[in-house]
Amino acid sequence: MLQYAFMRNAFVASFLIALLCPLVGMHLVLRRYALMGDALAHGSLAGVSIAVSCGIHPGWGSFFFTALVGVLIEFLRAFFKNHHDLILSIVLSLSVGIAVTLLSSGLIQADIDSYLFGSILVVSTRDLWIMLALSVFCVGTLALRYHQLLYLAFDEETARICGVAADGINYVASVVISATIAASIKITGILVLSSLMTVPVATALQLRVGFLLTLVAAFLFSMLDTALGLVFSYYLNVAPGGFTALVSVVVLMLVIALTQVGRART
């Protein structure tokens, strides 16, 4: 399997995704904003459609449009403070509307199925460099703003009182999430990308350990999910994103069962 260059590229890409998605997903889950990943992933579909119709690399189109959608979500929070789910519905409507309009217009001649469902055949060396650049940007930004993001995740109002520039940090977080999505969609697919942001984190939370240990556990579960999903999708000839999502849910169910059995014995 590893004698093929495309599989080696796919494993490197999966490793980067396994590091990035839980890092961003932890922030979303703790803020009870898990569906934001799904909304932004659909925003990336519109970005890919716009980029392909304009002859731009789809990865960059995905990043810039998804970042714009993320900024729009934060902007709308000021008008719908108690209705975050409504904001996501508005953004989903905008993104899907743009994507469907362009896809049905005949302006797009390329096949974008690989972006919808993921593919291990289309990750080139150029894509890896783009993913690496976006990964460095995401990890570096989150590391610089780690403490502020942690305060916001647990109690935004108290963080504001303590002097944290919540609005600015939220905009930065939206851009980082957008970069993560742009780096991941080619191998995971737009339709199931949000599962890699949230399910490994949900699995790690079952262990009931501290924040840093939970984050480390989420990394490990994410790597396990993506590795198994990639290997099985290769041998079964199915889309890697969908199978990885199935694996992640199965692992979550197993961890829940094992932790419940362990607690019942104590």
From Swiss-Prot:
Keyword Transport tagged = yes
Question: Where does the signal sequence lie?
Answer: none
Q: Name one GO cellular component term.
A: ATP-binding cassette (ABC) transporter complex
Species of provenance: Treponema pallidum (strain Nichols)
Q: Which family does it belong to?
A: Belongs to the ABC-3 integral membrane protein family.
Question: What protein name does the entry list?
Answer: Probable metal transport system membrane protein TP_0036
Arranged from A to Z, the UniProt key words for this protein are: Cell inner membrane, Cell membrane, Membrane, Transmembrane, Transmembrane helix, Transport
Q: Enumerate the subcellular locations listed in this protein's record, separating them with semicolons.
A: Cell inner membrane
Q: Where are the transmembrane segments?
A: 10-30, 34-54, 56-76, 88-108, 120-140, 172-192, 211-231, 238-258
User: What does the UniProt function comment say about this protein?
Assistant: Part of an ATP-driven transport system TP_0034/TP_0035/TP_0036 for a metal.
Q: Which InterPro entries match?
A: ABC_BtuC-like (IPR037294), ABC_TroCD (IPR001626)
Q: Name one GO biological process term.
A: response to zinc ion
Recorded superkingdom: Bacteria
Main location class: membrane
Q: What membrane topology does the UniProt entry give?
A: Multi-pass membrane protein
